[in-house]
């Protein structure tokens, strides 16, 4: 029997956000307990909240918006690789040792998965180095998933990792919690909200063993 791993971070009022992004608010606007016929909530958050997909439009005005990412890129075989806690920057050299040629979806587990449950943002999270991003582009990867709110070094000042990937329409999925699944081959499903013309969107993401 297949096992399904839910990789998604819960979206809740006051939940973890990247510094400068909108805060999360989930408020009950109509309540049965107060005489309404149904419960209806008002939800406020940014497009890069929790587990989410970055589209090319995140950094390029003429880039592909999130609603136009082909579903074929978001669903299919994926490899989950893991790095020890002392790896703080995932470089091309790190990735070359994993024999990723032929893989279309690469998911990178680091010490960050343990940080996702913390209420406070941790700025020294592990990130994908620009040369690592270029290596993944060079071998034909179409989707990269990471386990913190950004794939880029905090306050990098250049956004080279994002731009290297998104310029080639490589989908970036951030905020994936890889605490439960062991490294290996899986079926990956990531379905961002269909926000028309938007630069990114929260998503429900799972691995199926």
Report residues per predicted region.
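Active-/binding-site microenvironments in catalytic and ligand-binding cores
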Residues: 1-209
């Amino acid at each position: 029997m297949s096992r399904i791993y839910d990789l998604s971070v819960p979206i809740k009022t006051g939940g973890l956000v990247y510094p400068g992004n909108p805060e999360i608010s989930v408020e009950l606007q109509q309540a049965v307990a107060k005489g309404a016929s149904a419960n209806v909530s008002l939800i406020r958050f940014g497009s890069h909240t929790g587990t989410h997909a970055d589209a090319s439009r995140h950094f390029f005005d003429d880039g592909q918006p999130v609603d136009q990412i082909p579903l074929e890129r978001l669903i299919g075989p994926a490899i989950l690789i893991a790095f020890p806690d002392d790896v703080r920057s995932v470089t091309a050299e790190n990735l070359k040792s994993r024999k990723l040629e032929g893989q279309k979806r690469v998911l990178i587990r680091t010490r960050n998965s343990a940080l996702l449950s913390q209420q406070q943002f941790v700025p020294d999270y592990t990130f994908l180095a620009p040369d690592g991003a270029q290596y993944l582009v060079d071998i034909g990867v179409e989707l990269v998933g990471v386990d913190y709110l950004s794939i880029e070094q905090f306050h990098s000042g250049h956004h080279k990792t994002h731009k290297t990937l998104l310029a080639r329409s490589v989908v970036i999925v951030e905020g994936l919690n890889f605490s439960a699944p062991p490294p290996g081959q899986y079926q990956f499903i990531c379905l961002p909200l269909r926000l028309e013309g938007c630069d990114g969107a929260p998503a429900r993401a799972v691995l199926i063993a």
